[in-house]
Amino acid sequence: IKYCGTGGVFSKGTRVGAQQYTPEEVAAIVDESHMHGRKVAVHAHGANGIKVALKAGVDTIEHASLIDQEGLELAQKNGAFLSMDIYNTEYTQSEGPKRGELEEFLRKDREVAQLQRDNFKKAVQMGIKLTMGTDTGVHPHKDAPKQLAYMVQYGMTPMQAIQAATKVGAEALGIEQTAGQVAPGYSADIVAVTRNPLDDIHSLDNIAFVMK
């Protein structure tokens, strides 16, 4: 179950990070979802909306651009996952005008991009669970590997970035017993690249072969 806990970059007329639900409303969303065996994801840029979600027991935070130190510590304590799509601003700023995106959206993206990256680096240093996100609908899936290079640039090792896109992603979705690893009994699409991604993470931008 996903809900929009704060204003967004591509939300017309909203302030990025403005809290949109009361703590009581968020608690009801999380409690009902968990009671039915569903995980809860929240679209949240702003620090207050993030902390309300984490205190209610949300499972994953999407974006987490303006998360503060208290929010980082809550995520660490709760074992929550952060999905911080730190490549997206390059795509938004280069392709947004061609797609007719509003200047409001482009401006808001510029305002939060570096803050999100700085907070991603802090999260890496704290050992918080980070998974790769694509921001579906904003960023094309074919460019998803570009996120990995930025994750390395902002503090991860290449192996940590690859695991964020595979093993940790499966854990975030609750399917870690059947996916996320190349192991007996697991489902996986296996890719081949021309160079070792542990030496050059950009090699994952050019997939030579996919074995389903």
Region locations from a protein language model:
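Histidine/acidic residue-rich metal-binding segments in metalloenzymes
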Residues: 1-5, 9-82, 98, 110-130, ...
